[in-house]
Each structure stands twice: as C-alpha cells, then as structure tokens.
Amino acid sequence: MAQKIIRVGNIEIANDKPMVLFGGMNVLESRDMAMQVCEEYVRVTEKLGIPYVFKASFDKANRSSVTSYRGPGLEEGMRIFEDVKQAFGVPIITDVHEPAQAAVVAEVCDIIQLPAFLSRQTDLVVAMAKTGAVINIKKAQFLAPQEMKHILSKCEEAGNDQLILCERGSSFGYNNLVVDMLGFGIMKQFEYPVFFDVTHALQMPGGRADSAGGRRAQVTDLAKAGMSQSLAGLFLEAHPDPDNAKCDGPCALRLDKLEPFLAQLKALDELVKSFPTVETA
C-alpha cells in the first residue's frame, strides 16, 4: 500500500518514514515559557535526530469551566509563534476553532489543526482546507476510525490533500478514554500519515469536576504501544511544572524527562520500521 508523503519545509511525514514529533505545550501561558519549552524540545530532537514541529494552542475554546484559562488569544498568540519561529527556525502547529481564524493562522503556522470535538463541523473543515495549509485532523472521541474518510473527503473536495490523521483515544463510558490499537491500521488504509496524540489519550475528561484529569504516569507505556504500529509520528505535550500547568497538567510529561522518553520512542520506531511487512489478509 503506497503511503502519501506530506512535506513541511524540509520534513517528510509518512507512515513509512522516520517518526516526526509534534511537541510543545498545551496552551501558551507566556512568551517566556513558550521559548523555554521550545528550546528544550529543539535541544533534545536535534540530539536524537527527530524531525520536530512546535505545538501550542493560542485559545482553548473547549475548556470544562467558563472560568478556566483559555490562552492569550489569536493576535498575541500569533505574535508569540512568530517569535518562536524567528528564534528557533522550527515549523509551528496550532489549532483553530472558528472558520474566520483559519486564514489568519495559516499565514503564520505551517500546520493547522482541526480539533477532535469540531472534526465534523463542515464549515470549519472547508475553511481550513481552502487555506491550502497542511491540516492535522484529530479523530473525535465519538468517531470510529473508518469514519475519518468522510472528513478527508470534505478536505479533498475543497481542494486540499495535504492531510494528516491523529488518534487521541475514544470515549469509554463516562470520564474515560481508551485507544483501539487496531484503529491505527484502519486509518493507515487511507494512505495519509497517521499520528498518535498520547497526551490527550491519557485524559480523563471531566475527571476533576471542572477540568480534565489524566494519567501522566502511564505516558511511556501508552506511547510505546501506539508507536509500535509504525506511525508517521507522535504528538506530545510537556511542561516544566505539570502540577501547576494552566491546562491538562495531569497528562503532560515533565519537561526534564523529555530526552530519555524520546530516546526510547525513537529506538522503538526504528526497530518497528526495520521489519518487513507480513501480509496476513
């Protein structure tokens, strides 16, 4: 099965290429923290030889509580992203929540992300597709892997085939998510690159009454399980002080654990992709 290659700058993204990292922090808390986090990601990924794209959100529009921190907003967020790109020369990925944001974000960011909760919103999908930017499509917690073909079709009909799919877990009763490992293979049949968002797969939605809980201690186990499926890359959020992060701290990797964590994932990715394909159908 031929696998599509998506190019972002000099990075090639495909299920049969070396893993790419979409990594950073959940939400922009400050310019200084964005610089601190990106600097460590750049140091580690350059040392390990992992192609890297910086990730953060300028607005978390789907927080559990109306009083929860959402981020600096569109204008300030784009200024911070421009500063990060200038300082480190890395591509940027961020999510958009409204059709009117798509073109503005695509002028600054290299990849625009369709949030899982909004992945069936046709107006948003079409607006994002029409920018011509690479789109990272998060699989909704309530969608089966095979249903992602409909979102891909919407983008393609709007003239965009620069697409990436991203697994982030499926609803399993209340306040819980599970990851169906067979779903990766189903989505890979569409031939687009598939990523694994291990951070949000660790969520316990609404698990802390007014915010999401998480299972940070299991991040390495779950990441290894996902990346054993020969994927295009990993989506990861880290924080210098997860217990005091303004969003999704319970799921975030400690920033000082980034290097040993990624070293194991890179070794696993290389091993898995060294195996010949065994046809069992």
Curated annotation (Swiss-Prot):
SUPFAM superfamilies: Aldolase (SSF51569). It catalyses: D-arabinose 5-phosphate + phosphoenolpyruvate + H2O = 3-deoxy-alpha-D-manno-2-octulosonate-8-phosphate + phosphate. Pfam families: DAHP_synth_1. Disulfide bonds: none annotated. One of its GO terms (molecular function) is 3-deoxy-8-phosphooctulonate synthase activity. Keywords: Cytoplasm, Lipopolysaccharide biosynthesis, Transferase. The keyword Transferase applies. Pathway: Carbohydrate biosynthesis; 3-deoxy-D-manno-octulosonate biosynthesis; 3-deoxy-D-manno-octulosonate from D-ribulose 5-phosphate: step 2/3; Bacterial outer membrane biogenesis; lipopolysaccharide biosynthesis. InterPro entries: Aldolase_TIM (IPR013785), DAHP1/KDSA (IPR006218), KDO8P_synthase (IPR006269). GO terms for biological process: keto-3-deoxy-D-manno-octulosonic acid biosynthetic process. GO terms for cellular component: cytoplasm. It is found in: Cytoplasm. Its EC number is 2.5.1.55. Belongs to the KdsA family. This is 2-dehydro-3-deoxyphosphooctonate aldolase. The gene is kdsA.
